[in-house]
From Swiss-Prot:
UniProt remark on cofactor binding: Binds 2 magnesium ions per tetramer.
Molecular-function GO terms, alphabetical: ATP binding; catalytic activity, acting on a protein; magnesium ion binding; phenylalanine-tRNA ligase activity; transferase activity; tRNA binding
Name of the protein this chain belongs to: Phenylalanine--tRNA ligase beta subunit
Domain (FDX-ACB): residue spans on this chain: 708-801
Record-linked Gene3D superfamilies: 3.30.56.10, Bira Bifunctional Protein, Domain 2, Ferrodoxin-fold anticodon-binding domain, Nucleic acid-binding proteins, Phenylalanyl-trna Synthetase, Chain B, domain 3
Protein source organism: Streptococcus pyogenes serotype M3 (strain ATCC BAA-595 / MGAS315)
Quaternary state and interactors: Tetramer of two alpha and two beta subunits.
Cofactor: Mg(2+)
Record's keyword terms, sorted: Aminoacyl-tRNA synthetase, ATP-binding, Cytoplasm, Ligase, Magnesium, Metal-binding, Nucleotide-binding, Protein biosynthesis, RNA-binding, tRNA-binding
Taxonomic lineage of the native organism: Bacteria, Bacillati, Bacillota, Bacilli, Lactobacillales
BP GO terms, sorted: phenylalanyl-tRNA aminoacylation
Gene this protein is translated from: pheT
Domain tRNA-binding, first and last residues per copy: 39-153
Length: 801
């Protein structure tokens, strides 16, 4: 919100500098982004009166004699297409500074002396987007009353101070000059002074010319007035200046009045050309599928049933709350104007403007809320301005569909409630003074008082809101700083916290680096690596499609991080993350998703760099599985790895599901080469675990065993197997032999080559046996090996080599 300091002073009698005002506003709840003075950096710019203007043959140039208040006219060569004799212009005399600190000097153009420059607004630093179209390709023409030789700043209000406010959604009341005036008046204990317009109505009633109706629950009220015999022309200079300083391009007096009212009241308005209506009844309804509308910017908009439209003769003529239609726009020939003031549902307007990527000053205000109490006042004010600036005749009364409550909202609390929360010792008299400054009504006493909150402050509805207002006006800097009086409370980590801490420590001990990725991603990535995808939970109003859906897996976000690092030549990565995924078993539009803690990691590149002693070693499936084995061993959990080809984004031959108590709790494996290519990453291995399942399976008590003094015995066994037999199947077969003295199974060799028949492989294991209470004998171990050999032969078809 851009606030004119000059305009603000007309509404509130304050005697402070713009800088002091900005600082005070920032400390009381409305942040000031900065202050801009349009004239800053400009100098020696004066009013000039073009006495004569002669075309220079065979050029686009004009030789002008300009009165700049000096004894003799000043000769200036100008190339602007709209320069002519008799107009008042902006002249930069030699030594002047214009935009970009450019200095004007005497010079010669085509051999003709030029003692200055006739300037356009662009050359003064104004943006093309706010300059009136009639002057966008030429010089600015000043009002006839401008005096030659005077500094031009006061005529264009370039000496104003423009205060830029950063308005948070809860303070949308400050998206209007009246709202800002109320705020400033409360800060300084002043009163507001709003000008009144003398509206004179004709004998003809508005209801004779127009009728309005509402056919949607998303329209709270819709009101109109009619102004006849309007003369469309450029707005007076003061109004154009005000709009340009607010970042709005002046169009004509009718459109400019609606924009002025928007800035002044915060009430969006629209003006229709009544003579372009095919009917005299306006109906506001939801658009129908397949309908379209050409908006004022010339774009054809395809509408949906979620859009609101203003219709005449059942045809859309405006996109409600967003932008008017081209078919009924005001032009130079318009004579009868229909003014619209309405309140539309903010969510509906936000959805339409977001879908069409069509943001406007009007849609912004409807999205955040408007003051119900001034809808009709703003409508009357606009009609009175058209009467004044366009010489229009205002029909009596207005037509309205839908009623709004304009009564103050009553909120009750007590003095103790306020002081306890602020740590203050305010008296009831202090409370009365503060709410009087705010312009709020107050009844009751310190034991119970009720505040009547005007409709202009629709952000206040509960006692906590009153406390905030008291703190703001009293002064945040005056609130006492106290330390909590309560003593420390002994506590311990919850099981969830303890598990997270332990897993984090193990992961970092294994060389993984923690990252935090976005919980919001694209709908496609949200379910990409999910073992059991559920209903997708999507945001209704995402900032972008890249952050529009809640993730159902951790891996896709981690791969984004891998891709980011790989693109910057960092390809040896070992990352982990502990975070939440979001599962939705029911309707995501009606119920919140379940939040489940997950642990995931990813590794890629080299696990060992090449040097004079070591060969380079790339990560593989077993490195990823080794990380998990270490994790499960430290958690005292026993899992199974089951090969799977069902995960579309994982390599079908290098991926396994992880089972705990016969339940799938995660997966580990290589990212599918196609998926890796889509992410622009090298060969990458990932794993993801359900930490809630891990927590549920953790043993409640930790059992300690005495370290035995008896030695262990080791036996090696080499097996000839079919290539399809997995390591997990072999381990399962060995364990099924039921040898309770078997304490460790270690695979130490895998071989496939010329000495092994086709379709076969050799796997060698080291088996460790130990009796904690006695020495083992060779005979005992031999019996154990016979049992194990039998189990391997029967279950996996192994042949002992």
């Amino acid at each position: 919100m851009l606030v004119s300091y000059k305009w603000l002073k007309e509404l509130v009698d304050i005697d402070v500098t713009p800088a002091a005002l900005a600082e005070k506003m920032s400390t009381t709840g409305i942040e000031v982004e900065g202050i801009e003075v349009p004239a800053e950096g400009l100098s020696k710019l004066v009013v000039g009166h073009v006495l004569s203007c002669e075309d220079v043959p065979e050029t686009h140039l004009h030789l002008c004699q300009v009165d700049t208040g000096d004894e003799t006219p000043r000769q200036i060569v100008c190339g602007a297409p709209n320069v002519k004799a008799g107009i008042k212009v902006i002249v930069a005399v030699p030594g002047a500074r214009i935009a970009d600190n450019y200095k004007i000097k005497k010079g010669k153009i085509r051999g003709m002396e030029s003692l200055g420059m006739i300037c356009s607004l662009q050359e003064l630093g104004l943006s093309d987007s706010i300059i009136p179209k009639e002057f966008s390709d030429g010089i600015q023409i000043l009002p006839d009353e401008a005096v030659p030789g005077d500094a031009i700043f006061k005529y264009l209000d370039l000496d104003d101070h423009i205060i830029e406010l950063s308005i948070t959604p809860n303070r949308a009341d400050a998206l209007s000059m009246r709202g800002v005036a109320h705020e400033v008046a409360a800060i300084y204990g002043k009163s507001v002074s709003f000008p009144e317009k003398n509206l004179q109505e004709s004998d003809k009633a508005t209801s004779e010319a127009i009728e309005v109706a509402i056919a949607s629950d998303n329209v709270l009220t819709y009101a109109s007035r009619v102004v006849e015999n309007v003369k469309v022309k450029p707005s007076p200079q003061w109004l154009q200046n005000l709009l340009m300083n607010a970042g709005i391009r002046p169009i004509n007096n009718v459109v400019d009045v609606t924009n002025y009212v928007l800035l002044y009241f915060g009430q969006p308005m629209h003006a229709f050309d009544y003579d372009k209506f095919e009917d005299h009844k306006i109906v506001t309804r939801a658009a129908r599928q397949g309908e379209s509308l050409v908006t004022l910017d010339g774009e054809k908009r395809e509408l949906t049933t979620e859009d609101l439209v203003i219709t005449v003769a059942d045809k859309p003529v405006a996109l409600a709350g967003v932008m008017g239609g081209q078919a009924t726009e005001i032009d130079a020939n318009s004579q009868t104007v229909v003014l619209e003031a309405a309140v539309f549902d903010g969510k509906s307007i936000r959805k339409t403007s977001g879908r069409l990527n069509l943001r406007s000053e009007s849609s912004s205000r409807f999205e955040k809320g408007v003051n119900y109490a001034t809808v009709l006042e703003a409508l009357d004010f606009a009609a009175a301005m058209l009467q004044e600036l366009a010489e229009g005749q205002v029909l009596s009364g207005h037509v309205q569909a839908g009623q709004l409550s304009t009564e103050p909202v009553e909120v009750s609390t007590n003095l103790d409630y306020v002081n306890v929360r602020l740590g203050t010792e305010l008296t009831f008299a202090d409370i009365q003074r503060i709410f009087n400054q705010l312009g709020f009504g107050l009844t009751g006493d310190e034991t119970r008082f009720t505040v009547a909150v005007p409709r202009r402050r629709w952000d206040i509805s509960i006692p906590a809101d009153l406390v905030e207002e008291i703190a703001r006006i009293y002064g945040y800097d005056k609130l006492p700083t106290t330390l909590p009086e309560a003593g420390g409370t002994a506590a311990e980590l919850t099981p969830t916290q303890a598990l997270r801490r332990k897993v984090r420590g193990l992961a970092e001990g294994l060389g993984l680096t923690e990252i935090i990725s976005y919980a919001l991603t694209t709908p496609e990535k949200a379910i990409e690596f999910a073992v059991a995808p559920s209903h997708l939970t999507e945001l209704m109003w995402p900032m972008s499609v890249e952050r529009s859906a809640l993730r159902q897996n951790m891996v896709s976000g981690m791969l984004d991080t891998v891709a980011y690092n790989v693109a910057r030549k960092q390809s040896n990565l070992a990352l982990y993350e502990i975070g939440k995924i979001f599962e939705q078993e029911v309707n995501p539009k009606e119920d919140l998703p379940n939040e489940v803690n997950h642990f995931a990691f990813t590794i890629c590149g080299l696990v060992a760099q090449k040097d004079f002693q070591t060969q380079a070693q790339a990560v593989d499936f077993y490195h990823a599985k080794g990380i998990l084995d270490t994790l499960f061993a430290n958690l005292n959990l026993k899992v199974q790895y089951v090969p799977t080809k069902d995960l579309a984004n994982m390599h079908p031959g290098r991926t396994a599901l992880i089972l705990l108590d016969e339940q799938v709790i995660g997966f580990v494996g290589q990212v599918h080469p196609g998926t890796a290519k889509a992410y622009s990453i090298p060969e990458t291995y990932v794993a993801e675990l359900d930490m809630a399942a891990l927590e549920a399976a953790l043993p409640s008590d930790q059992t300690f065993a005495e370290i035995t003094k008896f030695p262990a015995m080791t036996r090696d066994i080499a097996l000839l197997l079919d290539r399809e037999v997995s390591h997990q199947a072999i381990v399962t077969a060995i364990e099924s032999a039921g040898v309770k003295r078997l304490t460790k199974i270690k695979l130490f060799d895998v071989y496939e080559g010329a000495t092994i028949q086709a379709g076969k492989k050799s796997m060698a294991y080291s088996l460790t046996f130990q009796n904690p209470n006695d020495n083992l004998t060779d005979e005992e171990v031999a019996k154990y090996m016979e049992k194990i050999t039998k189990a391997l032969t029967e279950q996996v078809g192994a042949e002992v080599r």
